[in-house]
Amino acid sequence: MLHVARQMMTAARTAKMSKIVVICKQEKLAVLQSALNKIGVNGMTVTQVQGYGTQKGNSQYYRGVRVDGPKLLPKVKIEIVVTSIPVETIVDVCKKVLYTGQIGDGKIFIYDVEEVVKVRTGETGYDALQGDD
């Protein structure tokens, strides 16, 4: 039994690391954070950003005249690095929470992560993603 547990820990430590970046509307952040926490995501970085996609932002007017060109809209960027939670699970949760069927629901980007280093302890890889930091 102990041998199986060690094999599982070794597999987790050598597991592929992935970074999921979600760009979405600010008002969806709290609900998404709660949903991700329920599936075991216990860390993320959130940044206030601006951007536009298909919706091209809202129309801007200056002294009653429409100003051409897209307007940057406020969004949030959520960054998550995982090893033990399947990327597909995180993507599914994000899609369920963010979907309205309207333009501007957001985007999800998935990247491979080569390495991670915890500065305080020097731990790398899987171990750097564990613990209280």
Predicted regions span which residues?
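Positively charged, small/polar-rich N-terminal and surface patches that mediate targeting and assembly
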Residues: 2-133
